[in-house]
Amino acid sequence: GAHLEAIRAAGGLRVVTPSRDFLARPTCVTDNPAEVGTVDYILFCTKDYDMERGVAEIRPMIGQNTKILPLLNGADIAERMRTYLPDTVVWKGCVYISARKSAPGLITLEADRELFYFGSGLPEQTDDEVRLAELLTAAGIRAYNPTDIDWYIMKKFMMISVTATATAYFDKPI
């Protein structure tokens, strides 16, 4: 759609934060996952109501060693994804970010406090987790790989639940 065309036309995705502006320049911009081929990691970032459709769309990128990291809000997201992808490794994760698509090709962040937590759920870090943490850090992302990822997911779930209740009760945005 218009977002994809704007990214292609600008040679990247423009990101505006309170402290900086930059153009993220991905090596591949497509709406066809089959063009990408199999990958090592998939960051699955969509809304809960689009999970089933999204899983169907990413299937061409899933190989024998692919790790999927869903970053949807909710306490049971990884478990639900595993029902769609029983033969694929699905990790757990959550992010704290306040961002929106302001216009085609433009993402606006409201704060400079982005946090990214992920993990396999195993008691020890795997080599693949260490590798992803290094890749994210090299890209300037504050990524953390705690062994107790479920605690971080539940903490965010509780924060969202309280916030959603308050905004619904008072009929006000955050």
What are these regions (language model features)?
Residues 2-3, 43:
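Extended, non-catalytic scaffold segments that flank or surround catalytic motifs
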Residues 3-6, 78-79, 126:
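Short, charged/polar "capping" segments at the starts of alpha-helices
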Residues 3-5, 24, 99, 152-153:
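Short secondary-structure capping/turn micro-motifs that flank functional sites
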Residues 3-22:
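Glycine-rich phosphate-binding loop and adjoining beta1-alpha1-beta2 segment
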Residues 10, 64-65, 139:
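Structured helix-beta-strand junction loops
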Residues 18-24, 134-137:
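Short, conserved catalytic or adaptor-binding loops enriched in Gly and charged residues
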Residues 21-106:
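Rossmann-like NAD(P)(H) cofactor-binding subdomain of soluble oxidoreductases
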Residues 60-61, 84-89, 104-174:
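Internal alpha-helical scaffold of NAD(P)-dependent oxidoreductase catalytic cores
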